[in-house]
């Protein structure tokens, strides 16, 4: 087994060489959001979409656009509004009166990295069109089906403050996002660095292309081979099952949980932990990798009860209690 682990470690070391210049390049224009940029890259490597919650002005758009520039892929931004139609996302067929036929006009979903801004402002049929494209990695326009080009990552944002005129995502649709991130303000020192950076540059700072898309696809193949010990697999399954039946693990949170995490959470937690280990240069997953990425995988998959809300308990507080009390292998 040690020989196999050594081979995987070597493969990870070789395949992850691009991550250092990638993060260095992102660090030139994005200050104080290392958590955001690392999780974006994890989503990209694990082939999972990301739901982002944070107030405006926290470099969400800049991060995604800069990442797209760094890896030579196409970036697209969708600003969702209540009057949008599915055709505004996936495209439509246009009638040509001269030829008497229809031509296909592809929508902004045909890109590699997509920022879906304020997804909860779009009506359900538009959300459904986007989420179907995310799940199937293909789009149907008229009677034609088009495959979406890899790598393909959707970063959808929600504003936690403004809830008027919004259409909250149903649990079944939120579950399709591998990660949900909560982004906070930068530290005071980091904010001063941002001010200095803007003083030195005219306009918005930009990044250079340092990674080829083939590097991302190769990294995904290596990540699939990263080793997870049976004990760590059991730990992952226990974590997810503890959100459904906490009393089985002697964790006193059952009255606060309305709906636990689905089996998709188990799969995504394993994939995200592998991608996290890859970024750390390892060919195997540790329980700490699972704990480090676990909150981002689980926070949007655990629905809380009215009793929990009355006691100001969030899904994060409940999940953290499970992490704290569940034995680590």
Where are these regions (language model features)?
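C-terminal engagement/docking regions of AAA+ P-loop ATPases
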Residues: 1-8, 13, 245-329
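Conserved C-terminal "switch" segment of AAA+ ATPases
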Residues: 8-16, 29, 166, 180-253, ...
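Pre-Walker A (pre-P-loop) alpha-helix and adjacent loop at the N terminus of AAA/AAA+ ATPase modules
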Residues: 12-58
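Conserved alpha-helical scaffold flanking the Walker A/P-loop in AAA+ ATPase domains
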Residues: 39-42, 95-115
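Walker A/P-loop
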Residues: 44-81
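P-loop (Walker A) phosphate-binding loop of NTP-binding proteins
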Residues: 55, 89, 157
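AAA+/SF3 P-loop NTPase mechanochemical coupling elements
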Residues: 103-112, 141-158, 169-178
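Conserved AAA+/SF3 P-loop NTPase catalytic/coupling segment centered on the Walker-B
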Residues: 108-135, 149, 164-173, 185-193
């Amino acid at each position: 087994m040690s020989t196999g682990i050594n081979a995987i470690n070597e493969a990870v070391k070789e395949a992850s060489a691009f991550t250092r210049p990638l993060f260095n390049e992102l660090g030139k224009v994005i200050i104080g959001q290392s958590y955001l940029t690392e999780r974006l890259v994890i989503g990209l490597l694990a082939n999972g979409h990301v739901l982002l919650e944070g107030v405006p002005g926290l470099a969400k758009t800049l991060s995604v656009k800069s990442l797209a520039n760094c890896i030579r892929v196409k970036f697209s931004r969708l600003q969702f509004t209540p009057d949008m139609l599915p055709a505004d996302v996936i495209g439509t067929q246009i009638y040509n009166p001269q030829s008497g036929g229809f031509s296909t006009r592809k929508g902004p979903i045909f890109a590699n990295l997509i920022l879906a801004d304020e997804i909860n402002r779009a009506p359900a049929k538009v959300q459904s069109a986007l989420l179907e494209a995310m799940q199937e990695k293909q789009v149907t326009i008229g009677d034609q089906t088009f495959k979406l080009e890899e790598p393909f990552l959707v970063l959808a944002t929600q504003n936690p403050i403004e809830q008027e005129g919004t259409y909250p995502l149903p649990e079944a649709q939120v579950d399709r996002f591998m990660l949900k991130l909560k982004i906070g303000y930068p530290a005071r020192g980091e904010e001063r660095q941002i001010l200095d950076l803007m003083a030195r540059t005219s306009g918005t700072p930009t990044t250079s292309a340092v990674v080829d898309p083939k590097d991302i696809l190769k990294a995904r193949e290596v990540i699939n081979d990263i080793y997870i010990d049976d004990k760590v697999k059991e730990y992952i399954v226990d974590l997810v099952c503890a959100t459904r039946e906490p009393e089985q693990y002697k964790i006193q949170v059952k009255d606060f949980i309305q709906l636990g995490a689905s089996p998709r959470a188990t799969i995504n937690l394993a994939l995200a932990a592998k991608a996290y280990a890859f970024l750390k240069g390892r060919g195997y997953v540790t329980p700490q990798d699972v704990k480090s990425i676990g909150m981002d995988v689980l926070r949007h998959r655990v629905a809380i009860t009215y009793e929990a809300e009355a006691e100001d308990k969030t899904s994060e507080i409940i999940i953290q209690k499970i992490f704290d009390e569940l034995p680590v292998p």
